């Protein structure tokens, strides 16, 4: 009996030695303004690990702390971190396969522009299509066996960001709600409210794609500067106080070409004035314009669908809420409702068109009143108009559905298979390559850190003590 107890205790000791003595030490994070900072001491005798969870609006700073008096070098793997990284590894090493970060996850904005290669900057992203971890290693040349881990962890999101993507991107590479392609002039209308995040993108997220030749974002630092009333260039800080734009206007992160054509604005929780602003994407002779209607609160203009331009049906015609905004009616919901309730009166709509063009004619009002009381004809026209409205609605819904899916057809989808899609398919069932490593039970239970054994160790020790007391 005693011999079995000793054998049991020996195996328990070896088990604990493996997972306690050799697990990584997770370093704490420090918050400073919009920065989330984690520092690693590469001269430490224990393998250290920094894990930062994605949070949009944050800038993540990893520091591989170097004692410059030692005159020793630090080594970073992959050597082009953050352009290349390891993904979804528990404990990667120098022989682990590298991936091109932006092929797999094009919305990640990160760089290492430090002369001594000891600082790494990343922006938190507003959208992630999957659960994924990006990892780099840093260590001292005098202690090459102790490799420290820096990790960015992303959780899958189901809700995309309000905004306009003019990059003709497939759904897997599109994080904005509205998709347009710059093969013709187009416009995109977004209605925003306090606390919303809004985005614009001009870039087709495929490396070296000819679509990206001769691209221009106007203004080139949208949303830092925006067009007010279509042609007046103003600072968003003055138009929408307390708003914040990502990427920030600083030299902290040197943007790649791809990330120079995308921008996000975070609206404050309180907005005092309704404002209409715009930015545009240009490709050769084609222009795609994004109109952003920022409201102080949700009212009759509130949109509950898929962020394409709302319309109120007037007989067999349509009047857009963008037009209502231009008329100055956004502050008068009663007048808007009056317009909608009179939709069977075609002359009333024509009257509003004249009003919009500042060409008011009193005779139009008299004609509209006369026709509105013309019984049988009005009823016949109303019935006919209802049919036209239904047909127009079906047509618009079909167009909206097409726009939402990025204006690409089945053949285009077969041809433009993205690097991300190839990677995703190659690591799943039906491929001869090994499956990509998934999150383990312990990672889901205790977090994404490679040191998830740390909590498991406590349970193990408690379990062994209980067994020991029972057997003793």
From Swiss-Prot:
Residue numbers spanned by region Disordered: 359-385
Keyword Repeat part of the UniProt annotation: yes
Statement: the UniProt record of this protein carries the keyword Methyltransferase: no
Superkingdom field: Eukaryota
Signal sequence interval, chain numbering: 1-23
Glycan attachment positions: 24, 29, 93, 112, 185, 295, 306, 383, 396, 400, 416
Protein name: Sporozoite surface protein P36p
């Amino acid at each position: 009996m005693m011999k079995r107890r000793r054998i049991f205790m020996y195996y328990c000791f070896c088990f604990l030695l493996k997972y306690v003595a050799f697990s990584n030490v997770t370093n704490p994070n420090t918050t400073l303004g919009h920065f989330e900072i984690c520092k690693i001491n590469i001269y430490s005798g224990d393998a250290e690990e920094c894990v930062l969870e994605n949070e949009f609006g944050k800038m993540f700073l990893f520091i591989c702390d170097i004692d410059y008096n030692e005159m020793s070098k630090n080594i970073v793997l992959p050597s082009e971190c953050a352009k290349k990284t390891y993904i979804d590894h528990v404990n990667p090493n120098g022989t682990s396969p590298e991936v091109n970060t932006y092929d797999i996850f094009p919305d990640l904005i990160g760089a290492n522009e430090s002369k001594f290669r000891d600082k790494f900057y990343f922006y938190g992203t507003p959208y992630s299509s999957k659960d994924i971890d990006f990892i780099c290693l840093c260590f001292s040349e005098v202690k090459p066996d102790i490799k420290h881990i820096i990790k960015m962890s992303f959780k899958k999101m189901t809700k995309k960001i309000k905004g306009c993507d003019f990059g003709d991107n497939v759904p897997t590479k599109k994080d904005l709600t509205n998709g347009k392609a710059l093969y013709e002039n187009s416009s995109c209308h977004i209605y925003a409210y306090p606390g919303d995040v809004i985005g614009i993108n001009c870039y087709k997220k495929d490396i070296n794609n000819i679509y990206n030749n001769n691209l221009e974002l106007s203004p080139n630092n949208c949303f830092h500067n925006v067009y007010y009333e279509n042609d007046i260039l103003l600072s968003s800080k003055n138009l929408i106080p307390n708003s914040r734009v990502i990427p920030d206007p600083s030299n902290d992160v040197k943007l790649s070409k791809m990330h120079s054509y995308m921008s996000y604005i975070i609206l404050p929780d309180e907005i005092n004035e309704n404002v209409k602003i715009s930015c545009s994407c240009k490709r050769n002779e084609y222009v795609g314009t994004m109109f952003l209607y920022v409201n102080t609160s949700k009212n009759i203009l509130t949109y509950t669908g898929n962020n394409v331009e709302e319309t109120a049906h007037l007989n067999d015609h349509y009047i857009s809420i963008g037009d209502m905004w231009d008329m100055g009616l956004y502050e008068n919901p009663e007048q808007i409702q009056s317009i909608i309730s009179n939709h069977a009166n075609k002359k009333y709509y024509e009257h509003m068109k004249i009003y919009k063009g500042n060409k008011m004619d009193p005779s139009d009002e008299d004609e509209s009143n006369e026709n509105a009381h013309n019984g049988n004809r009005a009823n016949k026209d109303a019935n006919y108009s209802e049919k036209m409205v239904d047909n127009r609605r079906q047509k618009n819904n079909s167009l909206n559905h097409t726009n939402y899916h990025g204006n690409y057809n089945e053949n285009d989808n077969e041809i433009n298979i993205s690097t991300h899609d190839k990677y995703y398919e190659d690591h799943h069932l039906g491929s001869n390559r090994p499956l990509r490593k998934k999150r383990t039970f312990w990672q889901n239970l205790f977090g994404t850190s490679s040191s998830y054994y740390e909590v498991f160790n406590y349970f193990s020790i408690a379990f062994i003590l209980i067994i020991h007391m029972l057997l003793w």
